[in-house]
């Protein structure tokens, strides 16, 4: 235990407070040092490119991870990363691509760039991930209200780096544009989409700015404001 004074960075000089506290966390009295890193699981087959945690139907946590060609679940009993990829695993991710995951009403959904369409795992009954038929491949994914929101997408053999593509209302399986509020939107003059933050509305991060996507219902579905 390190018995420093209270952290008071904005006080005058020569007070009893500490102005710099590195590698410590607050404790009942003062601060205590952070613990060293320790190994949590056995190794995957390749460098991990994403990790995600979600609770299953019983409330127990599950940990998922992905590398360049596989998706894994952490097995607590033996600390292994068990391959739960779809049959045949995945086309290798691009050099700069990573796995990004969401929890959508109990379904864990993963996006990994332009080489594989969205993957889904029912966190109560599934043993393997599976393709979401007719979904796009996407570099970015988020939950926005009752929609699965993707950005910087590829489908139909074409790549759309400045396009968002969202699912049908309250459905992760509906991706027919113009049906049940599934639709697309190009973000012009802002460069490629570099990220999406979900929530009540979409915060779309682009190379040259930020766009807000707000649900307004039919016929527009979402309104996008720069």
Region spans (language model):
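Hydrophobic or amphipathic alpha-helical targeting/insertion segments
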Residues: 98-134, 138
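Short coil turn/linker residues within repeat-based beta-strand modules
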Residues: 78, 123-125, 171, 217-218
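Blade-edge beta-strand/turn elements of extracellular beta-propeller
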Residues: 129, 213, 218-226
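Tryptophan-centered short beta-strand motifs
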Residues: 78-84, 125-129, 224
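Surface loop/turn motifs at the tips and blade-to-blade linkers of beta-strand repeat domains
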Residues: 40-45, 89-93, 130-134, 185-188, ...
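Acidic/polar residues in short coil/turn loops that connect beta-strands
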Residues: 112-115, 121-125, 144, 152, ...
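N-terminal beta-propeller domains
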Residues: 1-81, 137-212
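A broadly used, surface-exposed interaction patch
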Residues: 74-104
């Amino acid at each position: 235990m390190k018995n420093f004074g209270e952290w008071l960075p904005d006080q005058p000089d020569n007070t009893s407070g500490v102005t710099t506290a590195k590698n410590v966390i607050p404790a009942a009295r003062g601060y205590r040092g952070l613990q060293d890193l320790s190994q949590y699981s056995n190794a995957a087959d390749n460098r991990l490119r994403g990790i995600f945690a979600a609770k299953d139907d019983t409330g127990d946590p599950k940990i998922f991870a992905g590398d360049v060609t596989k998706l894994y679940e952490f097995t607590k009993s033996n600390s292994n990363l068990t391959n739960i990829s779809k049959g045949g695993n995945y086309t290798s991710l691009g050099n700069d691509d990573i796995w990004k995951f969401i929890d959508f009403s109990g379904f864990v959904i993963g996006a990994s760039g332009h080489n594989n369409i969205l993957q889904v795992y029912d966190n109560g009954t599934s043993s393997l991930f599976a393709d979401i038929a007719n979904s796009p491949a996407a570099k970015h994914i988020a939950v926005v209200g009752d929609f699965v929101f993707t950005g910087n997408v590829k489908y139909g053999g074409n790549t759309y780096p400045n396009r968002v593509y969202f699912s049908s209302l309250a459905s992760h399986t509906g991706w027919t544009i113009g049906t049940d509020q599934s639709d697309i939107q190009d973000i012009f003059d802002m460069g490629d989409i570099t990220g999406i933050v979900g929530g009540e509305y979409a915060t779309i991060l682009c190379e040259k700015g930020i766009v807000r996507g707000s649900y307004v219902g039919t016929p527009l579905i979402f309104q996008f404001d720069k």
